[in-house]
């Protein structure tokens, strides 16, 4: 509205601050401020806490039922992932990048193998 653009919010769930993943995403965020490329306009929110149950439910829905083990260790389905997570939230696999606006989830296995983070955005 009124010519204003809102930035997408990306949340990086990580165990500690200042990881390589966070540094790379920050570089892309800064680069995005200097370009007209709307794909690079985002706000990075870094969370060292595990996601809420509601957040995890959204993430699992976006990643798909067959890939729930990418977010929760040992999970065989969305329901199983939620149950395991309720009993032990440390089963959540980090780092994990979530683009809430686009419904994209990049689990740890993808983040740790990615050299070009712009492909995740």
Swiss-Prot record:
Span of the transit peptide along the chain: 1-17
InterPro entries xrefs: Fmp46 (IPR012882), Thioredoxin-like_sf (IPR036249)
Chief location: mitochondrion
Molecular function terms, GO-annotated: oxidoreductase activity
GO cellular component: mitochondrion
Compartments reported by the entry: Mitochondrion
Residues at the catalytic site: 96
UniProtKB keywords: Mitochondrion, Oxidoreductase, Transit peptide
EC id: 1.-.-.-
Keyword Zinc carried by entry: no
Keyword Transmembrane helix appears in the UniProt entry: no
Family: Belongs to the FMP46 family.
Job of this protein: Putative mitochondrial redox protein which could be involved in the reduction of small toxic molecules.
Protein name: Putative redox protein fmp46, mitochondrial
UniProt gene name: fmp46
